[in-house]
């Protein structure tokens, strides 16, 4: 679909912006893939009637999920309005979120080492946290490349 879309543009635009178009498609595809990788292990875990996440894991991830949802909503609004002003705020928020998610992984690894809880549940949780980090990263990367794609051509 990318090649068909670019065929409709003039050659100068394709040369100037084609890379950003393909990068945007890649980031959007990776974003969707990460969301499915986040959900699939959870669904399989539930379908197999394995133990649920413990209260600590639920609380930690719930807080992070709210922040991720807010980031995605803000980015969606900016994309829809083609408004990339103050994008640094979203970039900072994404960096903070990825730091929080890294901390969640470290905490979970410490819980595994102290042998508290189920290893199977911990593996599902670690997968969720890792894929949540990917969602945050790909969301911001999509924003950055979209901004580059939409920018007016600047001649030196």
Predicted regions and their residues:
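Cytosolic, long alpha-helical scaffolding segments
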Residues: 1-156
């Amino acid at each position: 679909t990318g090649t068909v879309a670019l065929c409709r543009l003039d050659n100068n635009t394709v040369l100037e912006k084609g890379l950003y178009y393909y990068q945007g498609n890649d980031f959007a595809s990776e974003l969707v893939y990460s969301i499915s990788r986040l959900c699939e292990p959870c669904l399989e875990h539930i379908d197999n009637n394995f133990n649920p996440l413990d209260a600590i894991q639920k609380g930690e991830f719930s807080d992070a999920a709210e922040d991720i949802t807010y980031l995605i909503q803000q980015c969606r609004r900016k994309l829809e309005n083609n408004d990339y002003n103050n994008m640094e705020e979203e970039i900072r928020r994404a960096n903070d979120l990825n730091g929080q998610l890294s901390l969640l992984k470290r905490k979970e690894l410490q819980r595994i080492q102290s042998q508290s809880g189920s290893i199977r549940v911990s593996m599902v949780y670690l997968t969720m946290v890792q894929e949540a980090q990917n969602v945050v990263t790909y969301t911001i990367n999509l924003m950055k490349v979209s901004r580059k794609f939409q920018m007016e051509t600047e001649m030196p």
